């Protein structure tokens, strides 16, 4: 069985998250567009654009505001450029063979959104009849006071929300959505809209910021976040857990989703800005974990700047240029993306091979993935000490990074330097 309507074009795809504001000194669509050939050469498949919409001025945070305080779902932030500028990105990306998904914000809007004035019933209100910002399960503010919480008991609001999504599918031919805070929106909304959206574009891709397994099990999304595993990886990098903790995720968490994909990552816009870059959180281990998330059975994500690399936290409400210069990790990511494209063992979900653990060890995470005669062996020392493991079968092939032949006979010792990795094809 193939994952819930996973588009064939996504079977061996990766995702690259684009932060337009910080991508170039100018922070515009037109300047980002110049990077498209470079990203194509790096093997990027899906461009996920953080919100590109106008940002509300009312209750704005910082000098530029949050990308997620949207004032108009059918327009673009004038600081980024015009709708036609963005459409030019979509068209060139498609010409290059890449797909485009938009970051959608279904849980709330900015306070300048036209619905605030024309349809106040579209929003959650307190006992005094005032529109509220998003509240937690205890009725307390979540601290997002720059946005107004939408009321999903209002069916007209739901209809308009879907209509705005369809606008982007029909008028601008985007390829899908990443839904912000999808876990805060009722499940039945997703069950309803997936049918409506697929009636417009049958092969769209849907990603949820969520770890609710029913978002996959109930055929609402193709992929959700692998947050639990990500936090485990951070803990391993910091010496708080051992590599064997990954087995626990596969044993107890992964099986709760009977279908679909987990998006795996070492960074994203939230993690970078609020918890630190992958270099800050993972130190010398950051490349080892990048190898891991790009070879596991989820769909991998790379965040803007990781190919530089970028050690700093990007400001969220202010201008803070990534500062691209040398793209020192571009070849590293190109090798990983190329292997995923070319070797069906690493394809996504049921298109690819399952994880088969080998050489089980507390500190070295090793596995094989096989599909239709194709095989990839991954061996990673996830510790800051030298480790030696014993091969439980013959291993022969070529390491994709060094280009050197690798051969271990059954019961042979394999020694690895701290955070060393081998990806053998």
Predicted regions mapped to residue ranges:
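Active-site clefts of carbohydrate-active enzymes
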Residues: 257-280
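Active-site-proximal helices and loops of the catalytic beta/alpha 8
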Residues: 180-262, 292, 309-339, 344, ...
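Carbohydrate-interacting/catalytic domains
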Residues: 1-48, 54, 87, 92, ...
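Substrate-binding/active-site clefts of carbohydrate-active enzymes
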Residues: 2-14, 21-27, 37-45, 51-172, ...
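Aromatic/hydrophobic pocket-lining residues that form the small-molecule binding cavity
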Residues: 32, 86, 158-161, 190, ...
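Short, solvent-exposed turn/loop segments enriched in Gly/Ser/Thr/Pro and often Arg
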Residues: 48-61, 103-112, 180-186, 209-214, ...
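Conserved short secondary-structure transition element at the edge of the structured enzyme core
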Residues: 290-308
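Hydrophobic faces of well-ordered beta-strands that scaffold small-molecule active sites
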Residues: 14-16, 47-49, 100-102, 177, ...
